[in-house]
Amino acid sequence: MKKIFGILALGLVYAGFLWAVCPGCRANTPQENAIIKPKSEMKTLIVYFSYTAGNTKCIAEKVQKAVGGDLVSLEPVKPYSDDYEKVVKQGREEVEGGYKPELKSLGVDLENYDRIIVGTPTWWYRMAPVVLSFLSSNDFRGKVVVPFMTNAGWPGSVITDMVSLAEGNGAKVEHAHAFKFSSDEKHFDRMVTPVEELEQWIDDLK
């Protein structure tokens, strides 16, 4: 019995040694990259993708007006068609296949920012492929990421997926939020989420 306890103790000591000397042997967690800057001192980048009614773009612009920072639209190298029905079909195929389109250059260097606010519409219960590409291909260690999404009543797993991707790439995620808009094709740009909720969310980012 003493021999067994001795082996266990030796194993624990060895594991502790690896933890101390081999950072690559342990998972990189958002807590290890905690941001110490107050919000007022953070340099902010707001990125978004918007295709039809421009709801995601509208919220991104409201955020920039209130919080400041740089505003950038995410664009695929191969643009989507103006044919809505065609893009609906294409979007479903891309989402179900986990497609990540190549993106045009942002025109800015992410290294220069402390906080990145990321907006996406909902495509077939998931984030738009363009945003999937952005969140999958960048290193967010040492940064705060604020995800938001717009939907017409079917939020799916968008926020959960965005948080998971951002944290997986090293981000500290804060204030993730979903905004609901009308599903009436004549009023796609009418926000159902109370304006007060949007305003409070923006205040929390200041």
What are these regions (language model features)?
Residues E85:
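Glycine-rich, pocket-lining loop/helix-strand segments that form or immediately flank
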